[in-house]
Amino acid sequence: LGDVYKRQKLAKRECSEARFTHNGKRYFAIAFPNGSGGFEVRNRYFKGCIAPKEISHIRQSGKARNTCYVFEGFMDYLSFLTLRQESCPNYPELDGQDYIVLNSVSNVNKALYPLGNYERIHCFFDNDHAGMEALRQIRKEYGRDLYIRDASQTYNGCKDLNEYLQKQVERKRQVRSVKETRSQSPKKKNGFQL
């Protein structure tokens, strides 16, 4: 329950709720803002965009950062923040770098100009052809001048960072379930029983 609460709190800080009509049906969804006034919207039944489609560039306040973490979609960005807070709850270091969310790998060209302001780029793309192609485009543009890290190795064996988080959550749930079952089992008596 604590994990769910943390994720909900994080989503409330980073996103908003959108209510909209699509094909004559009313929906509500989580809405993640982009840099042009549009939103990426998601719910169980719908994945889309309230135009215009654009990248989301999250800059930290204060001095300029020299590192940027780049994500394919906002669910991966939220998954990263969740994993970082869970692994380092007292000092998650979420503001040590800026973030760019492509909101689609087709937006990678829109991210190239702002990425030129960073010395280090960490790419958290999907483990598929489109993700590798986006990484290749960034390396082609800046490979000689900047440090570019393929961070998808962190969640190797999963499609993306969000799937990795979901597997971690499921693993924790299973461990908790086993512990609860063991604690509820009747204790064995010492000795033999005839």
Ranges and model annotations:
Residues 1-5:
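Short, small-residue-biased leader/transition segments that mark boundaries at the very start
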Residues 7-22:
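Short, basic/aromatic recognition patches
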Residues 17, 24, 65, 123, ...:
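Sparse, context-dependent recognition of short Cys/His-centered cofactor- or disulfide-binding micro-motifs
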Residues 82-194:
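TOPRIM fold recognition
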Residues 20-114:
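Phosphate-handling DNA/RNA-contact segment within nucleic-acid enzymes
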Residues 6-7, 68:
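Helix N-cap/coil-helix junction residues
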